[in-house]
């Protein structure tokens, strides 16, 4: 039997999403498999991540799937996209999004200016691998550990301020997913600082290299502040646009654009 699923395609600075309202899905769907199928760029719609959302009394619940069908704990760009979608559909400008237990406070100033307060970050190193393993890995790829930091923004990130060539970023991003280093994988941020701006590329676990990463921007901004490399406010620069970042009372606030690409119907065999 073929069923029809309404979807929205959006992107945040090139980081693209297929977004589906959970009310449009029956309980019979294998959501992990559906995410993989719709994310496939040749036989599906194509995206970096598949987003489900559901409206509750005073917040919207967001569930994130990677292209490999695994779940993600946070996505800043998807949050901005969802906030814009809700604004377009309802006119609401102040929107609360819940991802698991994390509350994200969103404000849509206008269609191209959406801010997200992602809250505080943690530099607790309990989830890091042993220092011996890290040193061995760092020496192999000439990474300066004094310029490397782990940060949890709701999902785990490693931020590397040592300059690496694009081909080396791919290798390092892939190999840091090794179970003996990070049991559940890790998002890897390659950051270069110039004039209080961070030029950033990100290897997202479960996805690979992406054109932009909102949670990576937040984690890298927080890491840059901790190292003293930048001050607040600052700018995160991606290939297809920038995010403005600031810190207020220990909270990280991200601001930038989100783009509506298409609305459509996906036909799914069950």
From Swiss-Prot:
The active site is at 75 (proton donor), 213 (proton acceptor). InterPro entries: DAP_epimerase_AS, DAP_epimerase_DapF. Catalyzes the stereoinversion of LL-2,6-diaminopimelate (L,L-DAP) to meso-diaminopimelate (meso-DAP), a precursor of L-lysine and an essential component of the bacterial peptidoglycan. SUPFAM superfamilies: Diaminopimelate epimerase-like. It is found in: Cytoplasm. Pathway: Amino-acid biosynthesis; L-lysine biosynthesis via DAP pathway; DL-2,6-diaminopimelate from LL-2,6-diaminopimelate: step 1/1. Homodimer. The keyword Isomerase applies. It holds the Pfam family DAP_epimerase. Belongs to the diaminopimelate epimerase family. It is an enzyme of class 5 (isomerase). It catalyses: (2S,6S)-2,6-diaminopimelate = meso-2,6-diaminopimelate. It comes from the Bacteria. This is Diaminopimelate epimerase.
């Amino acid at each position: 039997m073929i069923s029809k699923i309404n979807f929205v395609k959006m992107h945040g600075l090139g980081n693209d999403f297929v977004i589906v309202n959970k009310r449009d899905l029956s309980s019979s769907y294998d959501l992990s498999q559906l995410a993989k199928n719709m994310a496939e760029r040749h036989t599906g719609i194509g995206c970096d991540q598949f987003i489900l959302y559901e409206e509750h009394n005073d917040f919207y619940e967001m569930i994130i799937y990677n292209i490999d069908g695994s779940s993600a704990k946070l996505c800043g760009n998807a949050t901005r996209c969802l906030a814009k979608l809700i604004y377009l559909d309802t006119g609401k400008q102040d929107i609360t999004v819940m991802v698991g237990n994390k509350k994200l406070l969103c404000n849509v100033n206008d269609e191209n200016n959406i801010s997200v307060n992602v809250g505080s970050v943690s530099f607790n190193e309990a989830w890091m691998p042993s220092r011996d393993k890290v040193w061995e890995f760092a020496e192999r790829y000439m990474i300066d550990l004094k310029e490397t930091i782990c940060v949890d923004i709701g999902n785990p990130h490693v931020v590397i301020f040592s300059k690496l060539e694009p081909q080396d970023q791919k290798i390092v991003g892939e190999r840091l997913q090794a179970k003996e280093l990070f049991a559940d994988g890790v998002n890897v941020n390659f950051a270069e600082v110039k004039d209080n701006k961070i030029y950033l590329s990100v290897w997202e676990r479960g996805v690979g290299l992406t054109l932009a990463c909102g949670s990576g921007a937040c984690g890298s901004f927080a890491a840059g502040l901790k190292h003293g490399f930048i001050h607040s406010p600052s700018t995160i620069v991606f290939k297809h646009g920038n995010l403005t970042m600031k810190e207020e009372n220990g909270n990280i606030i991200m601001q930038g654009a989100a783009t509506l690409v298409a609305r459509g119907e996906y036909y799914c065999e069950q």
